[in-house]
Amino acid sequence: MSYYFKNLKPGYESDEELEDDEILKTLSKRYADEDESASDDELSSLSFDALRRAERQLEEESRKEKAGSQNESKPALKNAKRSKEKELELADSFKAKSYTEESFGENSDSSSENEGLFEEEEVVRGNKNSKADHGKNRKKSHAPSEQSSKKKVSRIRKIPGLETPKSMNENLYQDIRFDKSLGKAEDYESIRKRYQFLDEYRQKEISELSRLLSDRKFVNKISERERDEMQEKLTSMRSKLQTLKNRDLDRKILKDYETEINKGNKTKYHLKESEKRKVIQKYKFDHMKAKQREKVMDRKRKKRLGKEFKQFSFHNR
């Protein structure tokens, strides 16, 4: 068989369809040639005046478009600049701290202690913005100013009722049972009644100390410093016990005097502080011995003379 018959393949299209395609191609070529010739004829028929007018109109329209675009672009540029500035300010506020890394090469100074570490550099803009924000947050001039909690208090106020008396040292240990700020506000009388049994123990301690100090063998064994400390302790214990007894006596005197005054009265009468002092002095003076009265009178006379002596004119120079 020849080569021609080997390469033959069956076709699905009929001969009529192929003929129709060829006709359509020829018609489309014809119409395209006619359109080109018509456009050439139209351009050739136009005059030079019409072409000039058309060019002028096109130039005017292009100028107007340029002017309008420039006017519109100015506010757009301003808005763009403002938006960029705002973005930069926000970025600076968010950047609280920036870090710079030191060089690790051979040229770096070996004497620097911070070699290989990051140095913190506070941004100036961030500090300015924070100060401005702090100023804006303060509403009025009479508003309270903000202060750090680490700052010490300038003045410690004394609360009435919680002050330590002059006789007590503030640095000494204070019993919480008698502290007004921690316990109930109770009278001295109730506390004294509750702990009056301690007087017996105090008296025993005083007698024991006095017995040891009177013993010569014991005194020779200890040093002079220890002996002086024991003597001071003995005197302080005796004075404390005596003050407690004097307070009990004063309270008893006033109680008896008020009961005598308010026997037949429905409304109770309470003495003033000055009257209480006078009643106590009168009772003690009446119940003193003759020698004790003389000593008290001499002490008062010296006190009065000292006051009068200070009032003389030569002391005021």
Curated annotation (Swiss-Prot):
This is rRNA biogenesis protein RRP36. Associates with 90S and pre-40S pre-ribosomal particles. It comes from Lachancea thermotolerans (strain ATCC 56472 / CBS 6340 / NRRL Y-8284) (Yeast). It holds the Pfam family RRP36. Component of the 90S pre-ribosome involved in the maturation of rRNAs. Required for early cleavages of the pre-RNAs in the 40S ribosomal subunit maturation pathway. Keywords: Coiled coil, Nucleus, Ribonucleoprotein, Ribosome biogenesis, rRNA processing. GO terms for biological process: maturation of SSU-rRNA from tricistronic rRNA transcript (SSU-rRNA, 5.8S rRNA, LSU-rRNA). GO terms for cellular component: 90S preribosome; nucleolus. It comes from the Eukaryota. Residues 54-67, 82-100 have a biased composition (Basic and acidic residues). Belongs to the RRP36 family. Residues 1-20, 54-168 are annotated as: Disordered. InterPro entries: RRP36. The lineage of its organism: Eukaryota, Fungi, Dikarya, Ascomycota, Saccharomycotina. Residues 220-248 form a coiled coil. The keyword Nucleus applies. It is found in: Nucleus, Nucleolus. Residues 101-115 have a biased composition (Low complexity).
